Amino acid sequence: MQIHRLSPQLINQIAAGEVVERPASVVKELIENSLDAGATRIDIEVELGGAKVIRIRDNGYGISKKDIVLAVARHTTSKISSIEDLECIKSMGFRGEALASISSVAHLNLTSRTAKQNEAWQVYTERYTEKVMLLPIAHPVGTTVEVLDLFYNTPARRKFMRAEQTEFKHIEEVIRRMALARFDVTFILQHNNKIVQHYRAVKEPSQYWRRLSRLCGNTFVNNALKISWQNIDFSIQGWVEDPSCIKLPEMQYSYVNQRIIRNKLINHAIRHAYQDQLKGPHQPSFVIFIVINPQQLDINVHPAKKEIKFYEARKVHHFIYQALMTVLQQRVKLSSDTCYSTTQKPIGKIIPSHALNQLNEGKNNILVSYSAAAKNADELLSNQIIQDPDEAKMQDIPAKCQATKNSCSTSLSNDFYSFGKMLTFCSPCYALLESAQGLSLLSLQFAERYITERQLTPENNSDTILAQPLLIPLRIILSNGEASALHQHRLLLQRMGILLQPNENETILNAVPLPLLRKKNLSNLILDLLRYLNNETSVTYHKIASWLACSLNSQITTWNYSRAIPLIAEVERLCPHWIKNPPNALIVKLDLKMAIKALNNS
């Protein structure tokens, strides 16, 4: 098979497969560009759920004539220029591939004007050609991006698009998340020439509740606790569920430096803070904003920038946990003393965008000492004053909380699914945990092996594990015994996501399930698997999954908090019954009585 260089159009379409999943992905990328351009108003117009037209108009800085043609080229950006910039990302976008990727699967028109220019300029690609055209046009200061006929040249992708209303709901959710992150920006959404949503900019933090009620609903607003906590490294602001009030619809939005992200570490810290507050498997609702020095983050870990990694995961986890515990404990104390007869003013305010910029530049003077804040938590809470009657409305507590106040102060650990708080590692592969029942030691190796086994095992005989196609199919030479095992168990392996194409004394590996992608040498793994199957008289999904899990996880030698905490959370989610009755190989309670007795006698 001859190796050849891919064409620029094909390269862009491959990149678009990662960036442009559906119309909502296009809307997200373009809005992020508008926010990076300093826009205070963004108009979003879509037709037919975004399949026909997506038009994003903003009043940002605009793009000059000399840069506008370059803007639609791949890997061109004004946001970073060096490795140092990549390690300290302050903008929403940074890769410089969004416009190029979109233009490879749709017809794109880019119109922009800066304040220094007397006329605007438009760049567009001629249909069915790669030629870029530039012409002058009338346009106010700012930028308009028009995306027409999305996936017109990739019928397979267009076939997988959902119904018009479904795609539009995804776009609405993107706008909702963006509007929560940027209270200072007006968002106007139109669908089929009708205004569907109009979120007006809110300048004063005391009025944030107005947008919050529109985005999250009055039920959440009327039963949410305001959280505001800071130390020298981090800041957390937002609203969290009051566990003593009515059960809220599960709504979880977390932002880091104004970027909407999903992160198991954040969710785990919040869930542990609520471990004695909520009954059963109900998950707490929250809208939180975390500010952290961008040098302490790795944002370049996901094609759509939906995930991040913290360099100091343990410190972040501990900070979030302590911040929420302080707010929840103060609420319980206030409940037992006054039964919420007073109205609470939120502690502090949401950090404005200029504060984030100061933090990015290292000016940490906007943050106060965490220890000092913790010391004065009672004083901060007792000295709260209502400044706005509408703000008081947000903090009103329903009368029905009276009936449930006693439940907050009692432990609900029997009903909550958690092994406890992770303290540290014990070599080589154990985590030291602390819970209401004491200290325990959890085997991370056993936990990871079990999770991998679950990922590789179909729910029933009719199910099929999702296969991940390999970029380059792998050719594997087989012995007679290995070929015989493949012939006998090929369909079973196929249902497990391992797609092998036999051909005399060799096979082509086309796809594997996600966990197997971690394996460096897939060829050896497949050969070992076929030898194992050839020696087994009875083969089941569970046996193969167990063998693969042991083979994959035997290579793990080092652990970190970013890896361990989400793993423990995943075990808690998949196997809540293990909290009360764990397998002996997973966790063991530590008895410190003998050690304490020995110390006392020495």
Swiss-Prot record:
Keyword Amino-acid biosynthesis on entry: no
GO cellular component: mismatch repair complex
GO process terms (BP): mismatch repair
Alphabetical list of InterPro entries matching this protein: DNA_mismatch_repair_CS, DNA_mismatch_repair_MutL, DNA_mismatch_S5_2-like, HATPase_C_sf, MutL/Mlh/PMS, MutL/Mlh/Pms-like, MutL_C, MutL_C_dimsub
The entry's keywords: DNA damage, DNA repair
One Pfam short name: HATPase_c_3
Gene Ontology MF annotations: ATP binding; ATP hydrolysis activity; ATP-dependent DNA damage sensor activity; mismatched DNA binding
Keyword DNA repair in record: yes
Coiled-coil spans in chain: none
Annotated PANTHER family: DNA MISMATCH REPAIR PROTEIN MLH, PMS, MUTL, DNA MISMATCH REPAIR PROTEIN MLH1
UniProt function note: This protein is involved in the repair of mismatches in DNA. It is required for dam-dependent methyl-directed DNA mismatch repair. May act as a 'molecular matchmaker', a protein that promotes the formation of a stable complex between two or more DNA-binding proteins in an ATP-dependent manner without itself being part of a final effector complex.
Family according to the record: Belongs to the DNA mismatch repair MutL/HexB family.
Annotated protein name in UniProt: DNA mismatch repair protein MutL
Lineage: Bacteria, Pseudomonadati, Pseudomonadota, Gammaproteobacteria, Candidatus Palibaumannia
Gene field: mutL
